[in-house]
Amino acid sequence: MTHLAGRVAAGVVLALTIGVTTGCAPSIDTLVRDSLADAVEGAQDVLWEYRDQIVSDPEAAIAGLDFIGDARVGADDGNHSYTLLALDESEDSVTLTLAVDGGAQTGGGLGYQQSNAVTCIDLVFPTAAAEIRVEGAACGDVADVAGYEQVVPFGDLQVREVVTVADYPPPVCQCHSGGDCDCPGG
């Protein structure tokens, strides 16, 4: 009876360990949404430095950015971080509609999972304010064309909806001995 009790106890411990371990791990859907949120904020971050160019001449600015594929001229080859679906200019803003993708994998062996998804956003560059606003946009058939497993609505993501100059402070000025120094105060 002791031998049987030991086996039962070991089985219970194993079941509890597996239950606790898998119960604490984030789901694949959570990981995909986190990946998409990171990608949206990454788009805000990388486009901030081109904000003035995008506001003044958006077509030329976008043409010079190799990390944005332009789906308006044909199918994107998938070698870009972001896919431009539309570009709209008005008197008070420029709006880029982008498809942003993300993905995740979890587990290993029999528990391995992999998923990818896309969300579509409008990045609005107001002409009168140094900011970038992000809003949800319709993806159309981009998900079917590119083979994404799911389209995640922008509203399901937790991201900054507005970035301003306060989000991008200037780098700290550092001088090195023996070299020229452009820092204030020399």
Model-based region annotation:
Residues M1-V12:
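Bacterial N-terminal signal peptides that target proteins for export
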Residues G19-G23:
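C-terminal motif of bacterial Sec signal peptides marking the signal peptidase cleavage site
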Residues A25-I28:
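Bacterial signal peptide processing site
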Residues L36-G69:
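N-terminal alpha-helical signal peptides/signal-anchor transmembrane segments
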Residues E59-L85:
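Conserved non-transmembrane functional hotspots
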Residues E89-H176, D180:
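Extracytosolic low-complexity repeat regions of secreted or lipid-anchored proteins
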Residues D182-P184:
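N-terminal sensory and localization modules of signal-transduction and trafficking proteins
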